[in-house]
Amino acid sequence: MEKHSQKMDSGIDLTSCPIMPTYAAPDVMFVEGKGTELWDSQGRRYLDFVGGLAVQSLGHANEEIRDVIADQAGKLTQVSNYWATEHAHHVAVALDKAITGRMNAPEGSSYSPAGQVFFCNSGAEANELAFKIARKSSPSGRYGVITAMDSFHGRTLAALAACGQPHKHEPFAPMPEGFSHVNRDDLTALESAIHESTAAIHLAPIQ
């Protein structure tokens, strides 16, 4: 797409926007979407190959999702996880069954959870939880976490420490202790990195 002024037809000047410029300052403002297509405030059409940084693959303005959200908003929005909600229970059961290969269990068959589900907002939070569980459940105070070089696990401090990208650590030093990194596809290096304080090996097969 051709470059254009940051002064949008909507009257919003992105050069004076108070949103923190975590990445390069945006010069496009999206105002509408349908399926895989997006339109900016200049009326130009784009194909969305990003999907909310690979976390939203259901398309924009999905009518089924819109209707479900509207229906739920008329009943209950968010409550603390101090209490149970119907949908959280059903999703947790579905996840547990999917992970353990019991999605096609006969109707009415007995069900007993094989594990536990913790809902959170992002992959970084999920990784933080994994580190905490590994440390809390490890015997004799083990705390070390081994990850791969050039990996990415999130932007929160411990998740960032797990990333095998030293240049991303430098602006936030000192990083949390206990994280080490080995080259991918080097089993010998991985085995050598394991020692008496290792609590977990944290690898993402797809990066």
Where are the model-predicted features located?
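Glycine-rich loop-to-alpha-helix module at the N-terminal edge of alpha/beta enzyme cores
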Residues: 45-140
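Active-site-adjacent loop/helix segments that line or gate small-molecule/cofactor pockets in enzymes
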Residues: 2-34, 94
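Residue-level signal for pocket-adjacent positions within structured domains
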Residues: 18, 23-25, 48-53, 71, ...
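Active-site core of PLP-dependent enzymes with the aminotransferase class I/II
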Residues: 206-207
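PLP-dependent aspartate aminotransferase-fold enzymes
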Residues: 96-203
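Short beta-strand-to-turn element immediately C-terminal to the catalytic PLP-Schiff-base lysine
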Residues: 39-40, 58-60, 161-163
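Active-site and channel-lining beta-strand-loop segments
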Residues: 27-50
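Electropositive phosphate-/nucleotide-binding environments in soluble metabolic enzymes
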Residues: 9, 28-32, 59, 63, ...
